Amino acid sequence: MLNDFTGADKVYIACGCTDLRKGIDGLARLVQQQFELDPFTNTLFLFCGRRRDRIKGLYWEKDGFILLYKRLEQGAYQWPRSESEVKTLTQQQYRWLMEGLQIEQPKAHRPVTGLSAV
């Protein structure tokens, strides 16, 4: 379910390690206080533990929170290590993360913006 989660308008990841003993209330408080974001929006917030083999997702679904949890049996997520930072992911970066790849792919084509017809 977490690999193909498409219900959210935005996806944020909390860089660095998060204490995954936190539940819904603790993670929602972290989103509000540390990152100054609103957890009551159509947004998926992702958190990773120290060993990088487990992630938790927090998602508000109009009438309550959903807490998603995934533990890899082998391998680890390529999680950004910079502490106390939150990053917005594109859908492509989210797929890369769920596939075990780094969210910054140096060989990927970058989107082109600001073009005009000749």
Task: Label each region the model flagged.
Residues M1-V118:
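Polybasic/polar functional segments that serve as interface/processing modules
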